[in-house]
């Protein structure tokens, strides 16, 4: 697999997400649950040609539906939902020859300090033999939910942007969303697979780096 610059991928994802309409978060009770956010984000979208724009999400979409219905997941799939802490993770593992591959997708939800908004994150990562190996769809995306409109829109984060601006072109970076706490771990990977970590600190409405 050709390794793509994560900065380029991030920029492309930003343009695509910014062009999308707001995502409606449907819910039954007085306020949406974490599961409602997941369902809304994973819902397929279609272009003017009638083709699905998010086929790359079919794996996690299918695993989520199976998990919700209590059905057995496909071989290699796992899905963990921690609704109390607003965290979910999907993993798909497979082998090709002597290599072991894994797709890992994390989702997380934060309540903003103003009490009027929430921040939803979707974090896609790909690994080969335990090392980060970014592909076409890797990256961290944020959606900001407005209680008044019951919808969420793409929301760039200044802290994440600062990470990409600072890092060396020869270094890749991945993110680890929190299952406990509110801060995000940034993992920097050099060309030899050595990694160092820094923290993106939650500030009540986004992240500071």
Which role does the model predict for each range below?
Residues 20-110:
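Terminal domain-start segments
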Residues 100-105, 120, 129-140, 169-171, ...:
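Short, surface-exposed coil-to-beta transition loops
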Residues 89-93, 121-127, 184-191:
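Short beta-strand segments that buttress and anchor functional surface loops
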Residues 29, 50, 86, 96-100, ...:
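Intrinsic-disorder/low-complexity loop/linker signature
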Residues 151-209:
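Short aromatic loop motif centered on NTY/YTY
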Residues 115-155:
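Mid-length scaffold segments of soluble, non-membrane domains
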